[in-house]
């Protein structure tokens, strides 16, 4: 209870949806071998994903289920699955890896053993980008990957609601979606379009910064010109005042001179 609000992915639902996908790929009347590759089992995401997957698998008869803990990493997943393939000669029909990185490591081990075509491989994260989950699905490395939602926009909305004191849900679970070969290409295209728009926004932002700096520089130059013009105007006013003052003094001196000459002529007369 020592938190204001929580928003995050439903890891149990991710495991459950992965299990449901695996079940949909099973053939009736056949025993199956299932391998679950988890992260650190003591971690909450790993435990919740395992529980969801286990609940989806609980009513499957003749299922052999094994587990590998791979610490969320490619190298550990590759090494431990390779050991299983070599020492036990046990090839699973399905692999559910708790992230796409471990799924990729398991695929590499299967390729080395020559059994990659016999395994349906499911991961988690479904990130877009070179060599990431959506690419792996599109390239046939993974059969499916569950989206791990981050909800950035919803997080911002929730934070604003908390700050503004408006009503908000205290706990928000973000739903997942499954990416398969049928929609991976669409997601790649959407991501490419978003990336292009993001690049355009960054370009416009840089242009705006440049224009702002240019405007600021021009404004400073204009202010300097105005100051200089003001100084010139003040100096001009002083010069005009001095000139007019000089004219006035000259007139006064001329009058005084004329008066002195008149007085001198009167004395001579």
Sequence positions of predicted segments:
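Hydrophobic alpha-helical
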Residues: 52-53, 66, 70-131, 156
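Sec-exported extracytoplasmic/periplasmic mature domains
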Residues: 20-27, 54, 58, 82-89, ...
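Alpha-helical transmembrane signal-anchor helices
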Residues: 208-258
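Hydrophobic alpha-helical segments within soluble ligand-binding/sensing domains
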Residues: 6-33, 76-79, 103, 128-133, ...
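Hinge/cleft segment of the Venus flytrap/periplasmic-binding protein
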Residues: 41, 45, 57, 147, ...
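An alpha-beta-alpha
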Residues: 16-67, 159, 168-183
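Loop/turn elements at helix/coil->beta-strand transitions in domains of secreted/extracellular proteins
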Residues: 2-3, 29-33, 59-65, 90-94, ...
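Short, charged amphipathic alpha-helical "coupling" segments at sensory-output junctions
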Residues: 254-255, 259-268
